[in-house]
From Swiss-Prot:
Its EC number is 7.-.-.-. The chain crosses the membrane at residues 18-38, 39-59, 69-89, 93-113, 128-148, 182-202. It is found in: Cell inner membrane. GO terms for cellular component: plasma membrane. Keywords: Cell inner membrane, Cell membrane, Electron transport, Membrane, Translocase, Transmembrane, Transmembrane helix, Transport. It is an enzyme of class 7 (translocase). This is Ion-translocating oxidoreductase complex subunit E. The keyword Ribosomal protein does not apply. It holds the Pfam family Rnf-Nqr. Part of a membrane-bound complex that couples electron transfer with translocation of ions across the membrane.
Length: 231
């Protein structure tokens, strides 16, 4: 198995930032009331992850170890500011919807964790790919959780997609079933905690079943060595 395949498996499943590392839970639980918000935050996090991993990998040999964390945070903050200005300019409605959680990407442990644990120790290509896979894995968790909460709470999917993609995206909105009164438990933070717990439980069940299907290797018996004298 190549290193790229291993990085992809780690980011998407085995070491998923949301389901395994349980990092970035604050924005993950707060803004996933709709698929649109989940996609917007996931896209922003993905851009920052890839950019920060690349820049940290480039400067890793020039930054003293004693000040590496402040330097990494400054790099991440610069990228987050750039992404924030980009969303403010081209998706203002989404910018208002995400609110404070957009600049708080700076403190997201997923990003600083990958910068410290991976990008600071690997080359540019591997670091960029790691950021991409971790970002996609985190975004997938956001989207699945957002879809479940929106579907249960409002009976819709892609509500407000025009905030992210423009007026043409209004055609993407799907009314799966008619909801007279929104199911507030799904839309509020308690529903996010319950949904996240179900996702983690589902992953654990899948992992357990996959492990059970693997052929069990039987250890070879070890021959005993006689240590007593024979008279």
């Amino acid at each position: 198995m190549s290193q790229y395949q291993e990085i992809a498996k780690q980011g998407l499943w085995h070491n998923n930032p949301g389901l395994v590392q349980l990092l970035g839970l604050c924005p993950l639980l707060a803004v996933t009331a709709t698929v649109t918000n989940a996609l917007g935050l996931g896209f922003a996090t993905l851009l920052v992850l890839v950019g920060s991993n690349m820049l940290v990998s480039l400067v890793r040999d020039y930054v003293p170890k004693e000040i590496r964390i402040p330097v990494f945070v400054m790099i991440i903050a610069a990228l987050v500011t750039s992404v924030q200005l980009l969303i403010n300019a081209y998706a203002y409605g989404l910018y208002l919807s995400l609110g404070i959680f957009l600049p708080l990407i700076v403190t997201n442990c997923v990003i600083i964790g990958r910068a410290e644990a991976f990008a600071s120790r690997n080359n540019l290509a591997h670091s960029a790919f790691d950021g991409l896979m971790m970002g996609i894995g985190f975004t997938c968790v956001l989207v699945v959780l957002g879809a479940g909460r929106e579907l249960l709470g409002q009976g819709t999917l892609f509500e407000g997609a025009d905030l992210l993609l423009g007026d043409w995206a209004k055609a993407l909105v799907m009314q799966v079933w008619q909801v007279d009164t929104p199911f507030l438990l799904a839309l509020l933070p308690p529903g996010a905690f319950i949904g996240m717990g179900l996702l983690i439980a589902g992953k654990n069940v899948i992992d357990a079943r996959l492990k059970a299907r693997q052929p069990k290797t039987q250890a070879e018996p070890v021959a005993r060595v006689r240590i007593t004298k024979v008279s």
